[in-house]
Amino acid sequence: MATTSSNPLLLSSNFLGSQIIISAPTPKTTTKSLPFSVISRKRYQISQSEKLMKSLPSQAALAALLFSSSSPQALAVNEPVQPPAPTITAEAQSPNLSTFGQNVLMTAPNPQAQSSDLPDGTQWRYSEFLNAVKKGKVERVKFSKDGSVLQLTAVDNRRATVIVPNDPDLIDILAMNGVDISVSEGEGGNGLFDFIGNLLFPLLAFGGLFYLFRGGQGGAGGPGGLGGPMDFGRSKSKFQEVPETGVTFGDVAGADQAKLELQEVVDFLKNPDKYTALGAKIPKGCLLVGPPGTGKTLLARAVAGEAGVPFFSCAASEFVELFVGVGASRVRDLFEKAKSKAPCIVFIDEIDAVGRQRGAGMGGGNDEREQTINQLLTEMDGFSGNSGVIVLAATNRPDVLDSALLRPGRFDRQVTVDRPDVAGRVQILKVHSRGKAIGKDVDYEKVARRTPGFTGADLQNLMNEAAILAARRELKEISKDEISDALERIIAGPEKKNAVVSEEKKRLVAYHEAGHALVGALMPEYDPVAKISIIPRGQAGGLTFFAPSEERLESGLYSRSYLENQMAVALGGRVAEEVIFGDENVTTGASNDFMQVSRVARQMVERFGFSKKIGQVAVGGAGGNPFLGQSMSSQKDYSMATADVVDAEVRELVEKAYVRAKEIITTQIDILHKLAQLLIEKETVDGEEFMSLFIDGQAELYVS
């Protein structure tokens, strides 16, 4: 190979007859340089002329030859990026010459010849990467900060990325093959910011835990607290130092007896000396019992407003929480707060949520509710006592409460808040009419008589619905029509005014409802007819309203004749259909009537002793509630023969009622036609208009 002395990068040196020529790299070079000794070592390992090099007399002589230069600065050559750095190859210029006469030439290799077996692309598989390392094709690697990815630089200066698995031998493999190893410092390698970032998360975590526990010690239990983990055991009761319920006994109507009992409790709190001077003890608890909507919670609010002492209020369901033991902890916390404010009142609404009978044995394991009620029993009348704290509680299920909770010393008094009578309903209607524009034609007495069995909540809803109807009709005041329509809406649902009813169906419904009304009007000792309507409401195509006796409702006592009349009235609709339209054209409209008749007849036989064959014996006792420690289902305490007798007696009572109804309708068929025609024309007939059909006096009460 010829060289030119004018090229400063081509140097020659003669040593014992051998000539070493260092040729310049190809024009594609970079500015970064490496020592020639490093280049010689790397290229010597991969030289294809290794055998020829071994033919030299001595490797030491060759090393001396390579490092003998008068100008060390000239032994630095540029490291190319593409193609790779030059290598040292030893070639024999003439095989016939002696060893000392051989020429050793260092030339730049052909890049394609050495890198042709490297993988393509910038993303290598791990197996391809290991294969290239073992072949010496990888010059250096740089690991990511977490060690999951590395970036390699091949001998041809190509770069690729490899996803690194968890291989503990990788570092040893790289070191054995002379690969330069480094680790990325990450972006923005500022040590101060890295240090702060590493500390930030632990500081935030500890700060959050500290804040939560501080909130648990003085959080939701106090005013404005956010609560915390420790707050689970704290009571959720609302505390009022000076109760501002806005309710007094003057706002409570229709519960005079209950007010009298509770006014005495208020007097205990205001003037305790008057009672203690006579040796009387202040009652520790007062249980308000009554149906839903009778005003139990309203009475408790009135007590708070009248007493003027600190008032705690909570719902029993708030005691039981997700975690075991929280209920008992909250009971303790509630009474600790109450004792610190004594004398005071603690009101627990719907106490049956935690006060149910114990020992049902249904769930297995420990019942959280039992822990809560045990703690409540201890706080109300336990070893330490709770002097100065009066507990008010309300429930509509007194039958499910534990007997230990109802004994004297805990709930000393049970105040029954029952449905109001006529006088009470009049007072309640007046209370709920405050702030409403009531017309002069409204008679509270008549409205009260049309609403037997209504509670205070029902009457409040009635007046509210009447006000809504008046506003919908763009009226300036509430008249009796709005109250009447609101009453029917509450009882039977809204009118279906847009329902398309054929004339045939309207005629059928008119005769059906006329049959009910006619039989009811001519039955002795039965409720008077209040209104008849064939306007569809809810699931009913027509309705007949009767005004039940106030005395009968309050006493709950029904005679045998009344129950027999009730069955006959219920069958009057089906009888009218049969008489007018024939047996083949009767409809399913009497299905609810049959259910009512069957229920009344079976109760007369099984419970009320109105059957001669069964006698004064109750058969088929009601099943107990298994969650109250009672039997899972009712036991059949009678034989199959007795069951057959019961069925026969029920059927006989129903048949007798059917005969009575049919006799009335066939006898007074003219009045039936008049009433049905009036209903077809007007769709609604009130009780007075209906009774005017009997002015001629020809119709007489049915006598069996």
Swiss-Prot record:
InterPro entries linked: AAA+_ATPase, AAA_lid_3, ATPase_AAA_core, ATPase_AAA_CS, FtsH, P-loop_NTPase, Peptidase_M41, Peptidase_M41-like
Localization: Plastid, Chloroplast thylakoid membrane
Active site per UniProt: E513
Binding site for ATP: G290, P291, P292, G293, T294, G295, K296, T297
Pfam families in UniProt: AAA, AAA_lid_3, Peptidase_M41
Disruption phenotype: Leaf-variegated. Mutations can be complemented by overexpression of FTSH1. The presence of both FTSH1 or FTSH5 (subunit type A) and FTSH2 or FTSH8 (subunit type B) is essential for an active complex formation.
Induction data: By high light.
Membrane topology value: Single-pass membrane protein
GO BP term, pick one: photosystem I assembly
Ranges annotated as spanning the membrane: 193-213
Cofactor: binding comment: Binds 1 zinc ion per subunit.
Main location: plastid
GO molecular function annotations of the record: ATP binding; ATP hydrolysis activity; ATP-dependent peptidase activity; metal ion binding; metalloendopeptidase activity; mRNA binding
Keyword Iron-sulfur applies: no
Any coiled-coil regions, as ranges: none
Database matches in Gene3D superfamilies: 1.10.8.60, 3.30.720.210, P-loop containing nucleotide triphosphate hydrolases, Peptidase M41
Enzyme class: hydrolase
Gene Ontology CC: one annotated term: plastid
Keywords: ATP-binding, Chloroplast, Developmental protein, Hydrolase, Membrane, Metal-binding, Metalloprotease, Nucleotide-binding, Plastid, Protease, Thylakoid, Transit peptide, Transmembrane, Transmembrane helix, Zinc
Residues the record lists as binding Zn(2+): H512, H516, D593
Highest taxon above the source species: Eukaryota
Entry similarity comment: In the N-terminal section; belongs to the AAA ATPase family. In the C-terminal section; belongs to the peptidase M41 family.
Oligomer and partners: Heterohexamers with FTSH1, FTSH2 and FTSH8.
Function, in words: Part of a complex that function as an ATP-dependent zinc metallopeptidase. Involved in the thylakoid formation and in the removal of damaged D1 in the photosystem II, preventing cell death under high-intensity light conditions. Not involved in the degradation of the light-harvesting complex of photosystem II (LHC II) or in thermotolerance.
Protein name from the UniProt record: ATP-dependent zinc metalloprotease FTSH 5, chloroplastic
Primary gene name: FTSH5
